[in-house]
């Protein structure tokens, strides 16, 4: 009997480890490995890291987890096709992996603008099953769907929900920055009419945006207002992590000018250009007691001018105008160290340099404005007709970039070398679905192009740049261009003003010189508020060449004014009570 019992005990000892092993294996199949649980956490490595792990891992379940992590990060890196490829390889997923895969798929749908699909995918996910990290991703997708629908307030509300589940400081900062960007891109009237409905965090964000907008052009008051806001909302997420865009305001100092160096070509073939810009600059500063030292860049090298300016104690420069001189500064930024510089041109080499901004009358501004205007006018399949030269290529690139931002697709671009090419370019570029055409051409070419378009499709919406605006356009010509819209500087809105009549006489009604005068005028407006312009996000200046704001690399961006030919006259759009011609 004893021997039988002993044998039984020995059998139990033998089988117990085997039973435990099978039990644990069953748990792994049901719940996933301990590594699978990492899907519930943030993915902090790069996609390259997870891809290397995929190549190194032998365990099938861990391999699936690494593919999910790689796909998740690839989505955040905007590498959607690669992410989808990894998702397509997944097989035999456990419940935790299926749950995470569902989140990634919903995120991809939202990024692609498939809002209904993304919403349906989210509806299949039970929030109670998600970890805090996964819940933050869930609400990020909700926010993206709202953004796709241009519903910024709903996107902001989702971001607030998202913040509740973020523990990483960097992610919290990124979320605050995105929330602030949404607020800044929301119409002030919408912000003012939004009810926080007792949500203290939303109330704090709305108040912050309203105070910022109300005090944007009063920097000293703006800084004090932000401090007051912090005291009123001490526990707000933005009080702890102020949006990055606002953090620089703490060191803001108002612009004070005593001496300014103006660098222009004032002799040789470019003398007229330089003198016209100088006239505009001088007229703008006439009521300011600031000493201006003028340097002729045709007589001295840019290096000599900068050294001379430093010796004279000048710490603010306007210019140079010539591109080769701008490139000298871009390639040797130490030359302008400790100086404020407003270059009057930009080049393909332009880059971010401390205390340097680039200002010029670039075709890119008009092209971007045209893309936005056509989008707002419900044009969705535009044709862009441009000359086969530097102007045309720059215009086409800028329009396409803006169109990609608006619609996610490329614009249809057609180039022409000479007027004879235009007919072929139009017929080959137009399709039945084309609903608008943006044209870069001179005044005479524009009339020829419109004649062709009227024969092909007279219902097309037509847009042009300032290049086509000419003082030689008589009533008959203007009548022929009926309904065509074009962009130009706001200086042309009021042709009855004393300033306009003065400049019209000074330039002998030469539109190109009038543009240069307006540029010189605005150069003073910019340098006189240079710190405000550079350091206060959203700060704008209403100039003669447009509404001026600081873009990437401190490139001065211009919001253009749009005009329309109507019944033989030209009207600023939305101001049709006052004909300007």
UniProtKB/Swiss-Prot annotation:
Residues 1-26 form the signal peptide. A lipid is attached at residue 27 (S-diacylglycerol cysteine). The keyword rRNA processing does not apply. GO terms for biological process: peptidoglycan biosynthetic process; regulation of cell shape. Gene3D superfamilies: 1.25.40.650, 3.40.50.2300, Tetratricopeptide repeat domain. A lipid is attached at residue 27 (N-palmitoyl cysteine). Coiled coil: none annotated. Its main location: membrane. SUPFAM superfamilies: Periplasmic binding protein-like I. The keyword ATP-binding does not apply. Keywords: Cell outer membrane, Cell shape, Lipoprotein, Membrane, Palmitate, Peptidoglycan synthesis, Signal. Regulator of peptidoglycan synthesis that is essential for the function of penicillin-binding protein 1A (PBP1a). Interacts with PBP1a. Belongs to the LpoA family. This is Penicillin-binding protein activator LpoA. The gene is lpoA.
